Amino acid sequence: MQLIEIKELLLSHSKREGEQVVLVGSFKSIRSSGAIGFIAFSDSTALEPVQIVFKKENTPNFDEISKLPISSMILVKGVVRNTPEKKQPFEIQASKIVVLKEADPSYPLQKKAHGSEFLRENAHLRVRTNKFYVIMKIRSELANAFFEFFKNNDFLYVHAPLITSNDSEGAGESFEVISPNDPNYFGKKASLTVSGQFAAEAYAQGFKRVFTFGPTFRAEKSHTSKHLSEFWMIEPEVSLMDLDKLTILIEQCVKHAIYYLFDYAKPELEWCNENLEPGLIDKLNNVINNDFPRVEYREVIEILKKAVAEGVEFEVKDIHFGMDLKSEHERYICEKVFKRPVFVINYPKDVKAFYMKLNDDNQTVAATDLLAPGIGEICGGSQREDSYNKLLTRCLELDIDPEFNNLQWYLDLRKYGYYRSAGFGLGFERLLMYVTGCDNIRDAIPFPRFHGQLDF
């Protein structure tokens, strides 16, 4: 008799009526009377537990089993009984239960519901709850979706370095890397990467279509529901691409990911629809069945001015060209005005990074942010400045010394046939929040790192 997994039983139980099976796993709950007991049994291969029925008359260790602490590991030998009239499609009538590992009674995740903060304090255990089992399953499939998209579209996967000598965003929010035995280990200042973009740009000149996917680090002291100190970014880069084609690529990429989740994580999405965000399935269908609008930054400013005049309450009410849009403004645009993801394009140069291509008006850059309801910005991209002189001028305007900041190599790319390039950075956890209905980014990553917290 071979060991079988719940995942396989869910697919084949109707053909296994009366068949003897062996399962190994733990239980989420147990209840018993004097003669019969019921175990909610899980082996981590499926979301919902299987009911194990055990009786005193044929279970010599009935009393021991009945008193086992939650999360104890057991081996169950029993018979498959289909139960179409009950909530669960089948159950296992046990003939033998062996205790493999008894859990300590102090196990924190008892049968009662637990709050999000409590679960964050027990991040090493929270994957055993339905919520985090579902979110992390979707996270895995979401990553697979992007790999499939880029593979199908002939992108090369580039492993960008995690230790760098520059801050590609120029925001001064990088973590410094220092060897305790040799402070001058690299011969220059070293930092954890804030973006894989520069490496992607270099490789796009050799392979045309590339992408990076890895962790990035920001030394921000933000305590919001959308910020982490360590998070994952998807950063494609395509040579010869302009801003218009870039928005098309972003839209195709996001829609492919959602289609993929419908194919490979539909039960998990349905769980999220029932437990995290009612209407989630309809929202995602609306995303894949409609175009993402494109709206100019200048038009956004006029929309916001009109909203203020009509009495809409923003915390930041001084709406003017050149302002950096706040989350409240972004969400108003995508939630109240367009009611779906929307591209804002051609931002003022003073609120965007130095490497973005200057438009002919000399005021704006060929940049875009994709704004999503409930989240705000989930993706930012741009056409890159391809003129060496313009890029150097922009650096000097922002007091960025290419030599001092180890950026000369990046500028030098423009000397050697760098005609045009565009790319974007998509916050993986933010998109995961959007497709699951998860309301805090700290719950969209296995072990969250943020200011003041490093427990695991």
From Swiss-Prot:
Name of the gene: asnS
HAMAP family: Asn_tRNA_synth (MF_00534)
GO BP field: asparaginyl-tRNA aminoacylation
Record CDD domains: AsxRS_core, EcAsnRS_like_N
Catalysed reaction, written as an equation: tRNA(Asn) + L-asparagine + ATP = L-asparaginyl-tRNA(Asn) + AMP + diphosphate + H(+)
Gene Ontology CC annotation, any one: cytoplasm
Primary location recorded for the protein, binned into one broad class: cytoplasm
Gene3D superfamilies: Bira Bifunctional Protein, Domain 2 (3.30.930.10), Nucleic acid-binding proteins (2.40.50.140)
Compartments it resides in: Cytoplasm
Complex formation: Homodimer.
InterPro entries membership: Aa-tRNA-synt_II (IPR004364), aa-tRNA-synth_II (IPR006195), aa-tRNA-synth_II/BPL/LPL (IPR045864), Asn-tRNA-ligase (IPR004522), Asp/Asn-tRNA-synth_IIb (IPR002312), NA-bd_OB-fold (IPR012340), NA-bd_OB_tRNA (IPR004365)
Family under the similarity heading: Belongs to the class-II aminoacyl-tRNA synthetase family.
Name the UniProt record assigns to this protein: Asparagine--tRNA ligase
Keyword terms: Aminoacyl-tRNA synthetase, ATP-binding, Cytoplasm, Ligase, Nucleotide-binding, Protein biosynthesis
Documented EC number(s): 6.1.1.22
Annotated GO MF terms: asparagine-tRNA ligase activity; ATP binding; nucleic acid binding
Signal peptide residue numbers: none
